[in-house]
Amino acid sequence: MAQNSVSLSAGDRRSRVAYLSSSHGDLSSSALALAMVSGDSFLVTRPEAILPEPVPRSSVRLNFRTESRRAPGGGRSPTRFNEGREMEARSRSRQARFSPYPGPAVKLDLLRSVLQQRLVALGGVIVARLSA
């Protein structure tokens, strides 16, 4: 079954404006503007006026796959980061993000102190029992 609805991106707005202004004289320009801003312009347009024939989904997916798999290694070429300004951006992007949880070194220090406190407490209990 063919699908009649068409999803539009922001780049398609120019053709929508031309179609809306030419064929919908009964709607005011403010109503058309409101429909476009609110994203409800599909209610006042026909999909055929924007895209004359439906785009096959398989070709869209194929293009997306070729784009995402174009360059092995994350899409970065070795010559891209030669300038100093781009090197700074690269080092900034590799900085650790803020986390509300302690890092590995802090976790180890905390674990060490808790174990030490428990060992001291256990030692105190043992000494108290031996002396009793």
Curated annotation (Swiss-Prot):
Bias (Basic and acidic residues) ranges: 82-91
Pfam families assigned: DUF4687
Positions of the UniProt region annotated as Disordered: 65-100
Protein name: Uncharacterized protein C11orf71 homolog
Origin: domain of life: Eukaryota
